[in-house]
Amino acid sequence: MAHTVALIRGDGTGPELVDGTLKVLRAVDAEVDFVECDAGFEWWQAHGGSSLIPPDSWKNIESAEACLKGPTTTPAGSGTPGSVAVTIRQGMHLYANIRPIKTFEGTRRPLGDVNLVCVREATEGLYSGIEHRLSNDVAIAFRKITRIPSEKVAKTAFEEAKRRGWKRCFAITKQNILKETDALFMDAVRTVHKNYPNISVEEYFIDNFAQQIIKNPQRFNESVVFGTNLFMDIISEEISALVASIGCIYSANFGDDYAMFEPAHGSAPRYKGLDKVNPTATILAGAWLLEYLHEEKKADAIFKSTEAVIAEGRKVTYDLGGTAKLSEMADAIAQRASKNL
């Protein structure tokens, strides 16, 4: 029986990237029924409202087993709706954003090979959306940190290390300044860590870690780096720069019984319709979706085929040093994946 998955095509280059991903998923005969859901900045520009996600789309998202989301644009400025991703994370209680970051054979490695995983608490912190304008000259934002989400994201990090056979985790804080919120977070981490005696955990202040990951990134290979929402949003983006292109970085958001899969990059509206951008991240997000739905062989075929196409370098996009179009790279991955099953 086919799985039901909510599909958000997104803004800018999102629809093209999703089309390329669907082509690859069809090539491996993925047993998925996609339910298309309107959402994003372009939809909001046309229809207005207080949310980037209309009510009908919410119903489909809630009734699906999972969600595959293309990149979306979030409007800036006071009074505009919150992002699609943050809204779904909070609404579906997707407390852990996981971003694997690994260099690919055949690509530039600015500071050598890297292979680690970033885990980010995805529902609270400074992204809770609790902000107030007190006057024309004063605005405040609340950093909400609570025990249960902190324990859940710590458990996710330790479980991810355990699953991969890794022995190290690094918790990112600024506890010397944020003495209450980060103290609570680290207390939750230590509580959970008692259940993982074979995995070490080391606390790093965010400013020091941001420097150390550039000075010696290999020191953190085969480890899981985790922390609160804003800190890990910034750190995971920094670490992603150690890979040839942000177009290769994919991610997933997990709750207890739901998950959303997406590329880690933005919608790149200036490239909309040009068939130009790198489809790797969206395709690998689609592969991870299949793994989540227990179609592991098909997922593995896509992962290996994507790595092979990138390593060959003949059908890759401009950011990887090639001349292929988005659709041509997706075609190459799809053709190889269908043969690898």
Where are these regions (language model features)?
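Glycine-rich phosphate/diphosphate-binding loop of Rossmann-like nucleotide-binding domains
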Residues: 6-27, 135-208
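N-terminal small/polar loop signature for handling phosphorylated ligands or for N-terminal nucleophile
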Residues: 39-59, 186-222, 227
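Glycine-rich phosphate/nucleotide-binding loop
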Residues: 43-46, 55, 212-314
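Glycine-rich phosphate/pyrophosphate-binding loop and the adjoining helix
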Residues: 52, 129-171, 175-178, 296, ...
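Buried hydrophobic positions in well-ordered alpha/beta secondary-structure cores of metabolic enzymes
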Residues: 11-14, 65, 119, 157, ...
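Buried hydrophobic packing segments
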Residues: 21, 25, 189, 282-290, ...
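N-terminal glycine-rich phosphate/adenylate-binding segment common to multiple enzyme folds
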Residues: 44-140, 230-234
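N-terminal alpha-helical transmembrane segments of multi-pass membrane transport
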Residues: 13, 30-45
